[in-house]
Amino acid sequence: MLLLIGGLYGLYYIDYQEEHKEPVKVDVLRLEQPEFLLSEAPDDYLMEALEYYNVKHKNIVYAQAILETGHFRSKVCKEYNNLFGLYNSYKKDYYKFDHWSESVVAYLNYIQYRYKPPDDYYQFLIKIGYAEDPQYVEKLKNIVKRYG
């Protein structure tokens, strides 16, 4: 039996051999990968990743990454690949990712899935309690003005 499996890094063909009942990798077809998946520098490719993953309000989300990481210099950014300060309240620690682009996907899954357009995105962030800083939205607006 031949099985086609799609993943983040391409398509894999798996041939199940009936007599052994275990998968044997037969052939790998790699799809063209976005350049940001190969980059270790989120500041150079974050906007491309936000577009690739169809993130809404990209400029605001980009500003969040700048603010949360101190311009991509924080420990949480460098050691955990966490661009948005995503926190695991059960483990009482920040989420750790193998690659910074995984934090973009996590942002979509944990934060942005709750957003309902056409609501104001800044108000949405306040409503969900994204940050404890009462000046958080004003800081984001200033960053958006500065970086566009």
Residue locations for each model-derived region?
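Catalytic cores of secreted/periplasmic lytic hydrolases that degrade extracellular macromolecules
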Residues: 1-148
